[in-house]
Amino acid sequence: MNKQRRSQLSEIVGNLEVLKEGLEELKEEERECFENLPESLQESEKGQQYEENADDLETACDDLENLIESIQEVINR
């Protein structure tokens, strides 16, 4: 791979890392909303929705991290 394509991939990795940080912040906000609910409301539909949203955002963050690692492997070859 030439220097220009490596540079383009590095820029993409940087953009993905910014997106991942944004998702992590939103995940934490959802998790805090859930944890700040009284216990009786945590088991309500709304509470379960907060928890499910946080879990799905965590999965998305993990997927993005895997993508970033895969691209970095290509850059480092």
For the regions a language model picked out, list residue spans one by one:
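Long, low-complexity or tandemly repetitive, helically biased scaffold regions used
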Residues: 1-77
